[in-house]
Amino acid sequence: MLRVSSLFVSLFSLVFSGIVSVNGSHAADAPAAARASNSGVSGRWIINADFYGTAIFYQMYLKEESGKLTGDFAGDKLEGTVTGDTIHFVAKDEQGGTEECTGTVKDGTMSGTFVFTDADDPAHPSTHAFTATIAPQRRAGVPQRHEFTPTTFYRQFSSANKPVLTVSPGDTVHTTTVDAGGTDEKGVTRVLGGNPETGPFFVETAMPGDTLVVRLTRVRLNRDWAISDDGIVPRGLNTSLSLKMKDREKSVRWHLDAARGVATLEKPSEHLAHYSVPLRPMLGCVATAPPPAAAATPGAGDSGSFGGNMDFNEVIEGATIYLPVRTPGALLYLGDGHAAQGDGELNGNALETSMDVEFTVDVIPGKRVPGPIVESATHIMAVGLDGSIDDAFREATANMADWLEAKYALTPSEVAEVLGTSAEYKVSEVADRNAGVVLRINKERLQVLPTAAAK
């Protein structure tokens, strides 16, 4: 039951068992109710419910046999009937709450009302109108490659922003990003700074309750300089270091030598005359849009379960990012390229630069991660983002626990045994409002575990 009293927490609950390795297939099987399409009612439906003028999205699976209706509504098992074009069912949650649906189906569209009854407050049910359509199917044919030159850059991860390009699962997009200050590869400032993003990209068939898969096939430099800072952010300072750093907040320009694969200071001090760092291009921002019901639209410097300004230095060429879909089309944003960055983005700005980017998208239908998951050739990584390092640590741990439970059907005790012996933690972000902590597990440790589907 999606309790009305805690709707915005529970309606985005995790349902993502069946996610497979980046090297395997991502076409996760839909539940049996969606596969059995023996009537105009059976299938996977996307519901748009009207909560006091705000759209809230759900998924439900229906199976009709001889007038009897079974399936699930947002994870709650349902039973009901079909009489002509009229459907009626009741779904029940583990706490005893219910969702009662009465609707009609006409020309492939369902409409009607839901009555939500909270087990803790049964005397005050709430009634909401809805419409629903069968979940869209993947487009047939060969995946396309798109060349996209951005002309508009948004500074919010909003579901209201107009998509710049529509793509299908399996498609690849080649594009560019400006740097965090809004400057492009030619040194031309195109937009006000503040992590302006390329996108959003509308991904066909991606619906709330799905997982968006973003494979970064190319993250390359497209200019030879970057801007950073010479200070340390407040989370990294104690009293004595803070006093030493009080006058240190000026910009520092770096030279990017792609041929040698290193970055050096353009005007180094005597002690740093021979100092260099390896180039490791990354994207600070990869995000899907939060839902229309979000209390506030996050700016492009913010982060959360939708991804956003994660500033995680493993979001590099070859990485795959899994993000929850919370609005139709997912609305994918990318930006904030860094030529190199230490853990935490300790200076406040990394080596900020524009970037040449190519990515491929996919959709895992009916399964959703609770927050960003990053996969490399060697590790699976759960990103936790919250207001303090302690809270981000908890988020990363919970996200990985959910992933292990869903993928391998582990019990809580088994999850604890795996995490207690295999977890590797990194502080990924300390520069912005939310801190970031990442829990990594080497994938070799997990190879002996049977997946949930195999069980």
Regions found by a protein language model. Name each.
Residues S6-S21:
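Bacterial N-terminal signal peptides
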Residues G18-P31:
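Signal peptide processing junction and immediate N-terminal pro/mature segment
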Residues A28-P122, S126:
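Central antiparallel beta-sheet cores of small beta-barrel/beta-sandwich binding domains
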Residues A140-T189:
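N-terminal, Lys/Arg-enriched amphipathic/low-complexity engagement segments
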Residues T149-S158, R190-E197, P298-F306:
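Short, structured beta-strand/loop micro-motifs enriched in basic residues and often containing a Trp
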Residues V167, V203-A206, V315:
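Short, well-ordered loop/turn sites that connect or cap secondary structure elements
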Residues T211-P365, E405, P412-S413, V418-G436, ...:
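Glycine-rich anion/phosphate-binding loop at the beta-strand->alpha-helix junction
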Residues G371-S388, A392-A401:
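Extended amphipathic ligand-handling, pore-lining, and cofactor/metal-binding catalytic surfaces
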